[in-house]
Every structure is written in C-alpha cells, then in structure tokens.
Amino acid sequence: MAYKIAAPVLSNMSKGELKKNMQVEISPTWDGRSKDVTYMECFGRLMSGIAPWLSLPDDDTEEGKMRKQLREWALKSYAHAVDPDSPDYLLWRNEGQPLVDAAYIASSFLRAKDQLWEPLDEVTKQRYIKEFQLLRRIDPPYTNWLLFSAMIESFLMEADAQYDLFRIHTAVRKAEEWYVGDGWYSDGETFAFDYYCLLYTSPSPRDRQKS
C-alpha cells in the first residue's frame, strides 16, 4: 500500500514532472491560497510517513526492492524540491502554509537521516538549510504551528546548522502548558480533537501518561 501511494509521486518528481502530471482537485471550500501549496503538502507528508520504512536496511525481498526504488526516487525528488531551476521547485517563499509542510520534510530527514539526508549532495543540503531558515519570516500563531516551527529548528540543530533554540523551547513549553490530560493536548488555548499528538509526541520513560 505504501508503495502504491508513493510511487506515482516520487517517480514523477524524481524527473521534475510532479507539477506537470499531478492532477489537483480544489474543494468547494478552498480558502483561496495558491494551489502550489499542494505539491509541498503532498511531498512532505508522504516522505514523513514513509521515512521510517525507507530507513530499513536493503534486502533481496520484494519489499526490499520496492524500498530501494522509492529511496532512489526520493533522493532525486529532494533535490528537485529546492532547485530554483527545477519545474518541481516547491513553494517555499510565499504563503504561510509552507511552514507546516516544510516541517514534514524536516521530519523525514530526522526519521531517516542516514538514508535520506546524508546521501544528498552538498549543494542540495545547503539549499534545504537556507530554505528552512528563511521560513523564520513566518510568525506562527500560538497553536500547534509552534510545533511545526520547532520541528524545523530541531532538524537544523541535528544537521549542525544555525538554529533557533528559543523556537524549540517555546513550542515544548507551550505544549506542556496545553496538556489537558489523558494523552490529549489542546490546539493552543482551544481544545480540539485532532491527530497532532500522534505526530509530535513519543513514549518517554519520564512521563508515560502524557505520551
């Protein structure tokens, strides 16, 4: 199933043809943002989801061959995503939504650093670092968006790049403040039933109840 979802995206993006071939349908309730946010949302969330799977070692099984193929496509796709001359250069510098979806890309690097970040060439790495740092232009509201900002800064720290520790600490402190019990966190001051806790929290030996 993961391969069936990922292959159409990565096979096209690896050739710089995702925007050309991806069919985008707009909801009747679309809020008017640029449709180009769709491509980063698609790529970022896909890669964050399959990164742990792609981090598994290669083997000669059918699944192993699929992972290897996806990983090869993914590395080429990552390069297109930050290459200003590529048709698949993503929407990094407009709108506010890129803060959210770039965090998923950063998450994919954190989840499979050796497989998805380290093999990238130095030019591509520096482009990612620059794009991530430029997202500081976005002042996140006091909601779960603080966590997206912190995810990006956490990756920059992991990559030995200049990072903003205040953004990380602020997100962690606000998340602790917004804990409402029984494993749930509010989305800012307003409680909401959503899945963010599954994305941003993990079991901790120090606090099993909140995890």
Residue ranges and their predicted role:
Residues 200-209:
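Conserved small/polar residues in nucleotide/adenosyl-binding loops
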Residues 184, 210-211:
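Secondary-structure boundary/capping residues
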